[in-house]
Amino acid sequence: MNIKIIGVGKLKEKYFRDGIAEYLKRMDKFAKVKIVEVADEKAPENLSEAEMADVKAKEGDRILGKIKDKEWVIALAIEGKQRPSEVFAKEIADLGTYGYSDITFVIGGSLGLSPAVMKRANDTLSFGKLTMPHQLMRLVLMEQIYRAFMINIGSPYHK
């Protein structure tokens, strides 16, 4: 299985990079995991609705440029589908069973994802109504993907 995580912006803090590196190492035996960063659009404070839409569209174009046709895309969004870890694990396993070996997760920038990215997504995922920095969301997502693999092999990691 190939898993790609596309995120807007760079990870600046070493502790986030270290956490992600740890989960990349742990998942190496289950999947090939690739992190892809796309540039965030520099935007001043107090943007108008039109300016916010323009920022999301530009970031969205960069994201879409990193997605191949055959990839199953899951967009992370506050309004996405919430599910327990066990259900998420089963969905990941089922995707592999049904021939989707390339799964791409997309994390937007500070303004969220563009309508074009949401339209391209095959599914959505939400970890709740909380707003989180995209750097933290990458780490949380990595842990949940790892947890899914642990659930699927019956490991005591998930209690």
Swiss-Prot record:
Pfam families linked: SPOUT_MTase
Reactions the enzyme catalyzes: pseudouridine(1915) in 23S rRNA + S-adenosyl-L-methionine = N(3)-methylpseudouridine(1915) in 23S rRNA + S-adenosyl-L-homocysteine + H(+)
Cell compartments where the protein resides: Cytoplasm
InterPro entries: Alpha/beta_knot_MTases, RlmH-like, tRNA_m1G_MTases_N
Predominant cellular place of this UniProt entry's protein: cytoplasm
GO molecular function terms attached to this record: rRNA (pseudouridine-N3-)-methyltransferase activity
SUPFAM superfamilies per the UniProt record, alphabetical: alpha/beta knot
Highest taxon listed in the record's lineage: Bacteria
Residues where S-adenosyl-L-methionine binds: 76, 108, 127-132
The protein's Enzyme Commission number: 2.1.1.177
Keywords, ordered alphabetically: Cytoplasm, Methyltransferase, rRNA processing, S-adenosyl-L-methionine, Transferase
GO cellular component, one term: cytoplasm
Record note on quaternary structure: Homodimer.
Physiological role: Specifically methylates the pseudouridine at position 1915 (m3Psi1915) in 23S rRNA.
Assigned protein family: Belongs to the RNA methyltransferase RlmH family.
UniProt protein name: Ribosomal RNA large subunit methyltransferase H
Name of the gene this protein is made from: rlmH
